[in-house]
Protein backbone atom coordinates (compact mmCIF):
# COMPACT_ATOMS: atom_id res chain seq x y z
CA UNK A 1 0.00 0.00 0.00
CA UNK A 2 1.14 3.54 -0.70
CA UNK A 3 0.94 4.46 3.00
CA UNK A 4 4.28 2.70 3.42
CA UNK A 5 5.88 5.70 1.68
CA UNK A 6 4.49 8.41 3.97
CA UNK A 7 7.49 8.80 6.28
CA UNK A 8 9.89 9.01 3.34
CA UNK A 9 8.12 11.80 1.44
CA UNK A 10 9.45 15.36 1.52
CA UNK A 11 6.17 17.25 1.66
CA UNK A 12 7.81 20.69 1.45
CA UNK A 13 9.66 19.65 -1.71
CA UNK A 14 6.43 18.30 -3.19
CA UNK A 15 4.61 21.53 -2.33
CA UNK A 16 7.24 23.62 -4.10
CA UNK A 17 7.09 21.45 -7.24
CA UNK A 18 3.37 20.89 -7.99
CA UNK A 19 2.54 18.24 -10.58
CA UNK A 20 -0.40 15.86 -11.20
CA UNK A 21 -0.82 12.55 -9.40
CA UNK A 22 -3.83 10.44 -10.29
CA UNK A 23 -4.80 6.91 -9.33
CA UNK A 24 -7.27 4.79 -7.40
CA UNK A 25 -7.35 1.78 -5.07
CA UNK A 26 -4.02 1.61 -3.17
CA UNK A 27 -3.09 5.09 -4.42
CA UNK A 28 -5.93 6.51 -2.27
CA UNK A 29 -3.59 6.93 0.70
CA UNK A 30 -0.95 8.76 -1.32
CA UNK A 31 -3.29 11.24 -2.99
CA UNK A 32 -5.10 12.13 0.21
CA UNK A 33 -1.99 12.54 2.37
CA UNK A 34 -0.31 14.78 -0.21
CA UNK A 35 -3.39 17.00 -0.32
CA UNK A 36 -3.58 17.00 3.49
CA UNK A 37 0.09 17.82 4.07
CA UNK A 38 0.66 20.28 1.21
CA UNK A 39 -2.69 21.76 0.21
CA UNK A 40 -2.08 20.65 -3.38
CA UNK A 41 -4.86 19.13 -5.43
CA UNK A 42 -4.46 15.43 -6.30
CA UNK A 43 -6.80 13.21 -8.27
CA UNK A 44 -8.74 10.00 -7.77
CA UNK A 45 -9.33 8.29 -11.09
CA UNK A 46 -7.77 6.77 -14.13
CA UNK A 47 -4.09 5.94 -14.63
CA UNK A 48 -1.92 5.32 -17.68
CA UNK A 49 -2.65 1.59 -17.62
CA UNK A 50 -6.39 2.25 -17.62
CA UNK A 51 -6.08 4.68 -20.51
CA UNK A 52 -4.02 2.17 -22.50
CA UNK A 53 -6.35 -0.79 -21.94
CA UNK A 54 -9.75 0.98 -22.06
CA UNK A 55 -11.54 -0.26 -25.19
CA UNK A 56 -13.53 2.98 -25.25
CA UNK A 57 -12.01 6.46 -25.31
CA UNK A 58 -13.73 7.48 -22.06
CA UNK A 59 -10.63 7.35 -19.84
CA UNK A 60 -8.62 9.45 -22.29
CA UNK A 61 -11.36 12.05 -22.68
CA UNK A 62 -11.94 12.19 -18.93
CA UNK A 63 -8.25 12.87 -18.29
CA UNK A 64 -8.24 15.67 -20.87
CA UNK A 65 -11.43 17.17 -19.48
CA UNK A 66 -10.03 17.35 -15.97
CA UNK A 67 -6.30 17.99 -16.42
CA UNK A 68 -6.38 20.26 -19.48
CA UNK A 69 -9.81 21.85 -19.72
CA UNK A 70 -10.59 21.94 -16.00
CA UNK A 71 -14.15 20.72 -16.57
CA UNK A 72 -16.53 21.23 -13.65
CA UNK A 73 -18.62 18.20 -14.66
CA UNK A 74 -18.21 14.56 -13.70
CA UNK A 75 -18.45 12.09 -16.60
CA UNK A 76 -19.96 10.34 -18.37
CA UNK A 77 -22.65 12.81 -19.46
CA UNK A 78 -25.46 10.26 -19.18
CA UNK A 79 -24.41 8.99 -15.74
CA UNK A 80 -27.33 8.39 -13.39
CA UNK A 81 -27.02 9.92 -9.92
CA UNK A 82 -29.33 8.48 -7.29
CA UNK A 83 -30.40 10.25 -4.11
CA UNK A 84 -30.20 8.19 -0.93
CA UNK A 85 -30.74 11.06 1.49
CA UNK A 86 -31.96 14.54 0.47
CA UNK A 87 -30.11 17.76 1.03
CA UNK A 88 -27.49 20.21 -0.17
CA UNK A 89 -23.86 20.57 0.84
CA UNK A 90 -20.68 22.37 -0.15
CA UNK A 91 -17.19 21.30 0.78
CA UNK A 92 -13.81 20.09 -0.44
CA UNK A 93 -13.70 16.56 -1.83
CA UNK A 94 -11.71 13.85 -0.06
CA UNK A 95 -11.90 10.08 -0.31
CA UNK A 96 -11.37 7.03 -2.48
CA UNK A 97 -11.08 3.41 -1.44
CA UNK A 98 -12.82 2.83 1.91
CA UNK A 99 -10.23 0.42 3.33
CA UNK A 100 -7.46 2.98 2.81
CA UNK A 101 -9.49 5.95 4.07
CA UNK A 102 -10.26 4.03 7.26
CA UNK A 103 -6.52 3.85 7.92
CA UNK A 104 -6.26 7.65 7.79
CA UNK A 105 -8.84 8.45 10.47
CA UNK A 106 -6.42 8.90 13.39
CA UNK A 107 -2.67 9.11 13.91
CA UNK A 108 0.28 11.05 12.55
CA UNK A 109 -0.87 10.59 8.97
CA UNK A 110 -4.58 11.20 9.48
CA UNK A 111 -6.67 13.49 7.28
CA UNK A 112 -9.09 16.21 8.37
CA UNK A 113 -12.70 15.30 7.54
CA UNK A 114 -14.17 18.58 8.83
CA UNK A 115 -16.69 20.14 6.42
CA UNK A 116 -15.65 17.81 3.60
CA UNK A 117 -17.65 15.91 0.99
CA UNK A 118 -16.46 12.32 1.36
CA UNK A 119 -16.52 9.92 -1.60
CA UNK A 120 -16.12 6.19 -0.96
CA UNK A 121 -15.84 3.02 -3.04
CA UNK A 122 -14.80 -0.51 -2.13
CA UNK A 123 -13.85 -3.72 -3.91
CA UNK A 124 -13.87 -5.91 -0.80
CA UNK A 125 -17.60 -6.62 -0.92
CA UNK A 126 -16.71 -9.77 -2.85
CA UNK A 127 -14.76 -11.31 0.00
CA UNK A 128 -15.30 -9.43 3.24
CA UNK A 129 -18.57 -7.51 3.69
CA UNK A 130 -18.23 -7.86 7.48
CA UNK A 131 -14.81 -6.24 7.30
CA UNK A 132 -16.27 -3.34 5.31
CA UNK A 133 -18.87 -2.87 8.02
CA UNK A 134 -16.12 -2.86 10.65
CA UNK A 135 -14.23 -0.14 8.74
CA UNK A 136 -17.35 2.02 8.68
CA UNK A 137 -18.09 1.49 12.37
CA UNK A 138 -14.50 2.49 13.16
CA UNK A 139 -14.99 5.71 11.21
CA UNK A 140 -18.32 6.33 12.94
CA UNK A 141 -16.89 5.72 16.40
CA UNK A 142 -14.07 8.15 15.68
CA UNK A 143 -16.43 10.93 14.67
CA UNK A 144 -15.90 11.02 10.92
CA UNK A 145 -19.59 11.18 10.04
CA UNK A 146 -20.19 13.98 12.55
CA UNK A 147 -17.64 16.11 10.68
CA UNK A 148 -18.47 15.67 6.99
CA UNK A 149 -20.97 17.75 5.00
CA UNK A 150 -21.98 15.11 2.45
CA UNK A 151 -21.36 11.56 1.23
CA UNK A 152 -20.94 10.24 -2.33
CA UNK A 153 -20.99 6.45 -2.72
CA UNK A 154 -19.55 4.47 -5.61
CA UNK A 155 -22.15 1.96 -6.73
CA UNK A 156 -20.07 -1.22 -6.57
CA UNK A 157 -22.30 -4.28 -6.17
CA UNK A 158 -21.37 -7.91 -5.53
CA UNK A 159 -23.27 -10.59 -7.46
CA UNK A 160 -24.90 -11.65 -4.19
CA UNK A 161 -26.75 -8.33 -4.17
CA UNK A 162 -24.72 -6.83 -1.32
CA UNK A 163 -24.09 -3.14 -1.96
CA UNK A 164 -21.77 -0.65 -0.32
CA UNK A 165 -24.78 1.64 -0.02
CA UNK A 166 -26.69 -0.87 2.12
CA UNK A 167 -23.76 -1.47 4.47
CA UNK A 168 -23.17 2.26 4.88
CA UNK A 169 -26.82 3.01 5.59
CA UNK A 170 -26.97 0.20 8.16
CA UNK A 171 -23.98 1.72 9.95
CA UNK A 172 -25.25 5.31 9.78
CA UNK A 173 -28.65 4.14 11.08
CA UNK A 174 -30.41 7.42 10.32
CA UNK A 175 -28.27 9.39 12.78
CA UNK A 176 -26.94 11.97 10.30
CA UNK A 177 -28.73 14.56 8.15
CA UNK A 178 -26.14 15.26 5.45
CA UNK A 179 -27.04 14.52 1.80
CA UNK A 180 -26.04 11.12 0.42
CA UNK A 181 -25.88 10.22 -3.27
CA UNK A 182 -24.53 7.30 -5.29
CA UNK A 183 -23.33 6.76 -8.83
CA UNK A 184 -21.47 4.15 -10.85
CA UNK A 185 -18.68 6.28 -12.31
CA UNK A 186 -15.74 5.89 -9.93
CA UNK A 187 -13.82 3.14 -8.18
CA UNK A 188 -13.01 -0.38 -9.37
CA UNK A 189 -14.90 -0.10 -12.63
CA UNK A 190 -13.78 0.33 -16.23
CA UNK A 191 -14.97 3.90 -16.75
CA UNK A 192 -13.63 6.15 -14.01
CA UNK A 193 -14.43 9.82 -13.69
CA UNK A 194 -11.52 11.88 -12.38
CA UNK A 195 -12.27 13.41 -8.96
CA UNK A 196 -10.00 16.27 -7.80
CA UNK A 197 -9.21 15.84 -4.10
CA UNK A 198 -9.08 19.17 -2.29
CA UNK A 199 -11.36 20.95 -4.76
CA UNK A 200 -14.68 22.43 -3.66
CA UNK A 201 -17.84 20.70 -4.83
CA UNK A 202 -21.57 20.98 -4.24
CA UNK A 203 -24.20 18.27 -3.73
CA UNK A 204 -27.79 19.22 -4.56
CA UNK A 205 -30.17 16.28 -4.60
CA UNK A 206 -32.84 18.33 -6.40
CA UNK A 207 -30.67 18.47 -9.53
CA UNK A 208 -30.41 15.74 -12.20
CA UNK A 209 -26.61 15.80 -11.90
CA UNK A 210 -26.45 15.81 -8.14
CA UNK A 211 -22.80 16.73 -7.65
CA UNK A 212 -20.62 19.25 -9.45
CA UNK A 213 -17.39 21.12 -8.92
CA UNK A 214 -17.72 24.77 -7.94
CA UNK A 215 -14.10 25.73 -8.56
CA UNK A 216 -11.70 24.92 -11.38
CA UNK A 217 -8.86 22.70 -10.18
CA UNK A 218 -6.65 23.69 -13.13
CA UNK A 219 -7.09 27.43 -12.59
CA UNK A 220 -6.25 26.92 -8.93
CA UNK A 221 -2.83 25.82 -10.13
CA UNK A 222 -1.93 23.78 -7.08
CA UNK A 223 -1.89 20.17 -8.24
CA UNK A 224 0.71 17.41 -8.31
CA UNK A 225 1.72 15.84 -11.93
CA UNK A 226 2.77 12.28 -12.33
CA UNK A 227 0.13 9.69 -13.10
CA UNK A 228 0.64 6.31 -11.41
Residue ranges and their predicted role:
Residues 39-102, 106:
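Conserved anion/nucleotide-ligand pocket segment
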Residues 1-8:
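Long, hydrophobic/aromatic-enriched structural stretches that serve as scaffold segments
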Residues 155-228:
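ATP/nucleoside-binding phosphotransfer catalytic cores, i.e., glycine-rich phosphate-binding loops
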Residues 26, 101, 151, 198-201:
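Buried hydrophobic positions in well-ordered alpha/beta secondary-structure cores of metabolic enzymes
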Residues 9-34, 41-47, 177-180:
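Short, acidic/small-residue loops that bind anionic groups at enzyme active sites
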Residues 109-164:
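Internal helical hairpin/lid segments
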Residues 19-20, 40-43, 91-92, 116-118, ...:
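Structural motif
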Residues 28-39, 189-197:
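Glycine-rich, charge-decorated loop segments at or immediately adjacent to ligand/cofactor-binding or catalytic sites
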